[in-house]
């Protein structure tokens, strides 16, 4: 509602203080505070009728990241979880040495100190967990750095001989320990992660892509000197280097705990969006779309904007908007998606779908179709049990 689905004719307590502006596409209007993205509306398919029934961050993020409702208790690293979209798509790519099948940046998603489920490979197994990588540059959201010691830092200045020596020693230990182990353990999962990290450090195209200082200064500036922009720039460089799937978190790491900028605007929605969140989002996303087009990559690169849910149409007493999964907007670009279109609509107040209601599962099915994957494909978990990867139907966006 604050970005892709303005409601200029709604009552004041619903529409808020933001105005709407024309875009590059006749008849499509965006929020006034994303003027740069508005110039690229011809590349975007806006879906204004997504909805689900999960009102909490943990559950809302899970259903959007996996395309399935949570069943029972869900844990961040649970192997009974449905795999994330990134893990699912990466499963269909042929492995290449030194190039991870999926990367996520710059840190994990948290809600009030608890890591959220939905970013891992779940029942596909640890082999398909996206590699967590730091963004090496940019001002953090709200000045708060959410890094832990779990993110891979490819900027380490290690000589090849040192990495080789360490890997040889670890392999010797592995051979000894391997005689005492049977099925996959947490140690095995860590071992896979470590080997991938070593491969990337040893001259992989991924490590070269990670060095943002090698990028044209004009392009770096186009994305903005902020973690949000530099993360999207790194995303483009990683895709160029051969990484099939990149997931970028454009927010502070914790939605409800501590400081930092995030989209959970229960208080002071309008100044926070206007002064801190939308300027970074507008510059970074518009730069990514322009950059991909300039390099001839947009037709073969699918860009998908996901979130947990929308915000309440009516402004609360704290000048904020609360959780609202009843209807919200998402956007897609590239990868065969026809730009300059809007699918579905919300009602006059932005409270519920008015036409062509769709679900996160339908968004996932659309992504699978764009990637050349049949949404009805069956995959097997580590125990050999079959699962159809998606229950949704692709949207007619092509």
Predicted regions and their residues:
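Ligand-binding pockets and gating/stacking loops
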Residues: 1-398
